[in-house]
UniProtKB/Swiss-Prot annotation:
Keywords: Cytoplasm, DNA-binding
Protein source organism: Rhodococcus jostii (strain RHA1)
Role description: Binds to DNA and alters its conformation. May be involved in regulation of gene expression, nucleoid organization and DNA protection.
Keyword Flavoprotein: no
Record's protein name: Nucleoid-associated protein RHA1_ro04210
Domain of life of the organism encoding this protein: Bacteria
Classification via InterPro entries: YbaB-like_sf, YbaB/EbfC
GO cellular component: bacterial nucleoid; cytosol
């Protein structure tokens, strides 16, 4: 604080720049992170990036039944949802503390922030 109770603008600016750098680093980490989710006890696994992009899908041949496509569809959706939930948890861990530094207003465009 400067005399008269005024905040030191240069200190506030430096703090904002530091927070911006931390946020950018965390966002880059999330963009590069890959998380795997599974369904059916591992019969179907899905890999998503921290951004939510699905980058991999593995299906055990045992679960492929032409007469029961609906079960396979449910397992694929379940695996993708599991991976997406894990990615959101990681994002909350990495970005959540930074969001608090923005006055509690959250981060626009990021779910849960």
């Amino acid at each position: 604080m400067q005399p008269g109770g005024q905040p030191d603008m240069s200190a506030l600016l430096a703090q904002a720049q530091q927070m911006q750098q931390q946020l950018m680093a965390a966002q880059q980490e999330m963009a590069e992170a890959e998380v795997t989710g599974q369904a059916g006890g591992g019969l179907v696994t899905a890999t998503v990036k921290g951004t939510g992009e699905v980058v991999g899908l593995k299906i055990d041949p045992k679960v492929v039944d032409p007469d029961d496509v609906e079960t396979l569809q449910d397992l694929v959706i379940g695996a993708i949802e599991d991976a997406s939930n894990k990615a959101q948890e990681i994002a909350a861990q990495k970005l959540g503390p930074l969001a608090g530094g923005f006055g509690g207003g959250g981060l626009p465009g990021l779910p849960g922030f």
